[in-house]
């Protein structure tokens, strides 16, 4: 059988990323929600639990994919004129994370810009991201939360090991139903 080479696929060298099905109904996730929700409400008073999942990267991996999170993946919610906080994303590492183990990179103050999600998916902002991203050491069980408009990404995982994180997404309660109508993750997860 002949083998076809696609130059754009070379960017995927070393990629090994798994997203779980939604973990919303897990007892552990409910317990974590109960612990962190008071802090989330300090920043988004009408915060409502939207979704949670686990992302695992298998190293070594050079993959990055800078992006913004739900709801800003959808054009209606991705403009700075509506400068309200629409959502808060929570990352809880299930392994110790640092620069060698793929700690999430964030670009400070990037929530002040509009980021076209298709450009993000196509790698238009990769170079900008790598030049401006900051990474934080995050021991297992620590918490990083940020405005869902903030540009962020998994960073290269230089070691031959895995790294897993629990993600929890909170949204303003008045946009949840609209987002569920737009978001294809619900159809792929049986909701």
Over which residues does each language-model region extend?
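Short, glycine/small-residue-enriched coil/turn segments at secondary-structure junctions
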Residues: 77-85
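Non-heme Fe(II)-dependent double-stranded beta-helix
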Residues: 1-78
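Double-stranded beta-helix
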Residues: 84-87, 97-155, 175
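Secondary-structure boundary elements
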Residues: 39-48, 83-84, 94-100
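Short, structured patches in soluble enzyme cores that scaffold and shape functional sites
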Residues: 56, 68-70, 92-96, 106-108, ...
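Short, surface-exposed loop/helix-turn segments at secondary-structure junctions
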Residues: 67-75, 119-132, 181-186
């Amino acid at each position: 059988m002949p083998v076809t080479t696609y130059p754009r696929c070379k960017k995927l060298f070393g990629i090994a990323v798994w997203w779980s099905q939604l973990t919303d109904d897990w007892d552990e996730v409910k317990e974590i929600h109960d612990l962190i929700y008071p802090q989330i409400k300090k920043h988004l008073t009408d915060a409502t639990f939207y979704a949670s999942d686990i992302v695992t990267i298998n190293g070594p991996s050079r993959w990055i994919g800078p992006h913004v999170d739900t709801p800003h993946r959808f054009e209606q919610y991705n403009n700075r004129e509506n400068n309200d906080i629409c959502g808060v994303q929570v990352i809880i590492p299930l392994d110790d994370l640092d620069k060698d183990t793929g700690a999430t990179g964030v670009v400070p103050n990037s929530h002040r810009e509009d980021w076209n999600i298709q450009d993000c998916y196509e790698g238009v902002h990769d170079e900008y991201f790598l030049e401006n991203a900051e990474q934080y050491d995050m021991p297992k069980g620590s918490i990083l939360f940020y405005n869902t408009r903030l540009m962020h990404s998994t960073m290269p995982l230089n070691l031959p090991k895995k790294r897993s994180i629990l993600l929890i997404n909170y949204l303003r309660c008045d946009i949840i139903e609209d987002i569920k109508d737009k978001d294809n993750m619900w159809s792929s997860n049986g909701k």
